[in-house]
Swiss-Prot record:
The keyword Disulfide bond does not apply. The keyword Magnesium applies. Monomer. Keywords: ATP-binding, Magnesium, Nucleotide-binding, Transferase, tRNA processing. GO terms for biological process: tRNA modification. InterPro entries: Dimethylallyltransferase, IPT, P-loop_NTPase. Catalyzes the transfer of a dimethylallyl group onto the adenine at position 37 in tRNAs that read codons beginning with uridine, leading to the formation of N6-(dimethylallyl)adenosine (i(6)A). This is tRNA dimethylallyltransferase. Its cofactor is Mg(2+). It comes from the Bacteria. Substrate binds at T10, G11, T12, G13, K14, S15.
Amino acid sequence: MRPLAVVGPTGTGKSDLALGIAEALSGEIAVEVVNADAMQLYRGMDIGTAKLTVDERRGVPHHQLDVLEVTETATVARYQQAAAADVDAIAARGALPVIVGGSMLYVQSLLDEWSFPATDPQVRARWETRLAEVGVAALHRELAAVDAAAAASILPTDGRRIVRALEVVELTGRPFAASAPTIGAPRWNTAIVGLDWETTVLDERLRRRTDTMFERGLVEEVRGLIGRGLRDGVTAARALGYAQVLADLDAGGDGEAAREPTFVGTRRYVRRQRSWFRRDHRITWLDGAAPGNVDAVLRLWRQRRAGAPRPAD
């Protein structure tokens, strides 16, 4: 069974579209969803990631949700291996795997079957120590000195990716980008659709989404996760919303002041997602505001299933 992938920026309605597809195919083909949102991998990180509740999943099986504790580090390599096994198992039992998410590296690693550069714990630890000593901005400048292209593609505030880039450069002797695959035929011949909205409309959706998270108890969720080790999490503690609430609580606030930084950070992240996904010529884009998106996706998937080429844009 050839999979379907629903990708695109945060807040565009990808999960709802996937559920609509499952309902439209009910009685014809069973559908199972494979999550491709890195922060939804974490148990207890529900409100701030807009994770569907069990009831909201409408009986559709979901995979790669709630598989990590907040103290564990999420890695693209681990996700790729586990999610690929899920896709293969779903297809083997005659169901349709629908990959849903907007975590850029996670999506592409799965669809392009990335092979990952070697890692060395000692080299990684040395660069992490260097990060702690000089700070993220200085380490970003050090990366720029040895790999300008990598530095240009990594945010100066993203210490984890800066460390990884420096580790790869040291271990391989090549630029970080040289380890990344090119975009080719998608794994499993997956049909890929992207969902997006006009910018001003999406910004308003993101504003409402952020407000809803805080009204539903994001601050209380973060407080509860602190007791489970959130501050010690390398990746979980940096998640949008969680990082901002943590910072406000640590500064003596009640968490409410994190609302605006969370919205601004989410909007900035959406711009990065758009830039990333728009370069992928394999994606067929849909307007989130348009009617009939479920039917449009199913037409594309049926064409791909029958072996027809992707229609020209």
